[in-house]
Amino acid sequence: MSAHEDLVGRIQAHLRGRGELTEGRVLDGDGYFLDGRLVVAVMGSDLCIEIGKDQWDDTLASEGVTPFLFAELPVPGWVMIDGGSLSSDESLSHWIETSLARR
């Protein structure tokens, strides 16, 4: 199983039963939506989430976190979490819950 497939399975398990879970393409990744709203996107083995502009600078100081880039420019309020930082269910849960708090 690839790192991408493993991450997708863990995300699905975490979100299952919390609303209507749907999947769809988002830019270069696979988006996971609850009740029609994007929660996370998986791009390769990395995770993309919205954390909000108010938390952006503080979140970027976290290990394994970089700005999400669109057309080579950072998108304020959106971050990428390196797949290596998501090896534990606890770390993945933290980032999913951070994204859900923005809903």
Where are these regions (language model features)?
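Charge-dense, helix-prone N-terminal extensions
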Residues: M1-R103
